[in-house]
Amino acid sequence: MFSRTLHVYLKINFYFCGLNTLQTIDMDKKVITFGEIMLRLATPDYLRFCQSDKLNATFGGGEANVAVSLANYGIATEFVTRLPKNDIARACVMDLRKYGVGTSHIVYGGDRLGIYFLETGAVARASKVVYDRAHSAISEIQPG
């Protein structure tokens, strides 16, 4: 069982404070992450993009992944982002909730969810990632 605090090494570079240290997280507090979550389309079985006629769909993004990981340790988390109002975004929110991540501060607007394509490397071949993030809902968010 967890003690009232949990020591977690968070290697996250927040643009506003440069946090990159060993932190003590009070289990009674909530960790809030803010960032872009994207649709991840990955080739199966270590195939290259040109070899596969299928792509597996999941969701991912640095800050969302941190929220899910912390939620797995029993730490209350909330993910803040902007998503388009469509079925794919709803599936994304349902996926976060499945892992116990709070989604009550997600705002809706914009036309599209960012996408990234992953070709998982094999042996000496490195993985490849292709991003399609232009004009995503969060990239076009305005103050207010």
Predicted feature locations:
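Short beta-strand scaffold segments in enzyme catalytic cores
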Residues: 115-119
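Ala/Thr-enriched low-complexity intrinsically disordered regions
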Residues: 5, 21-24
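Glycine-rich phosphate/adenosyl-contacting loop at the front of the ribokinase-like
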Residues: 25-102, 124, 136-143
